[in-house]
Amino acid sequence: MRTLTIYHLGLIDYRTAWDVQRRIARARSAGQVGDTLLLLEHPPTITLGSRASTEHLLVPAEHLSAEGVTVVQSDRGGGATYHAPGQIVAYPIFKLLQHGRDIGRYLRGLEESVIRVLRDDGLIGERVPGLTGVWVRNGAAKICAIGIKVSAGGVTTHGLALNVNIDLRGFDLIVPCGVHGRGVTSMSAELGEVVAMSSVAERLIGHLCAVFDLEPAVVVTAGQWTAHLPAAERDHLAQR
């Protein structure tokens, strides 16, 4: 069974996390590191995927900036989504072919991992035909957004954003994932109580490992993670 290195990065801005993903993905493609999972939160940020445009912003960009919300055009798939503290963001950096999976099966695996996390807390997570992500209440509200990129070498970046205790008012700023007529929710909103983020994160790790046949090995905390990068990538980040 292959092992999984897990990086707990804490609160980190989107562009920095994106740069870290790219560097680990290059190392993964070169065989310098194994499969890796980044777990983190972002400050208030709207990301626009390959199917999104500024038309999916419901307020002017200058207003967003004044409110401290960053807007980033990302290279992931999907539409617009909102990130903020209280949301667990997971970025798996996997060599897709080593898991014997095509992109569709990989996406279904991410969804299945989240569905199992929700089931642990008595919530019924669902798929909606033709859409990516995890929903509740018969598809009425999205609880987890998923958007990925797969490199020419078959290495995945980006991933999923599971709403745990996030302030849902931030989603009023966008058309979430470009889908009209459906709501957005969180685990705490559905359960009526604050949910322990650490518990959700640990269970998400366990279910991802079960679905993708991985063994969690090295757990790296925010203050230590650069030491685990290949030297060339570590030196570059030190110069930032």
UniProtKB/Swiss-Prot annotation:
UniProt keyword list: Acyltransferase, Cytoplasm, Transferase
Signal peptide positions on this chain: none
Pathway assignment: Protein modification; protein lipoylation via endogenous pathway; protein N(6)-(lipoyl)lysine from octanoyl-[acyl-carrier-protein]: step 1/2
Catalyzed reactions per annotation: octanoyl-[ACP] + L-lysyl-[protein] = N(6)-octanoyl-L-lysyl-[protein] + holo-[ACP] + H(+)
Enzyme Commission no: 2.3.1.181
Organism: Roseiflexus sp. (strain RS-1)
Gene3D superfamilies on file: Bira Bifunctional Protein, Domain 2
Alphabetized InterPro entries for the sequence: aa-tRNA-synth_II/BPL/LPL, BPL_LPL_catalytic, Octanoyltransferase, Octanoyltransferase_CS
Active-site residues, record numbering mapped to chain: 177
Family matches, as HAMAP family: LipB
Site (described: Lowers pKa of active site Cys): 142
BPL/LPL catalytic domain location: 31-216
UniProt protein name: Octanoyltransferase
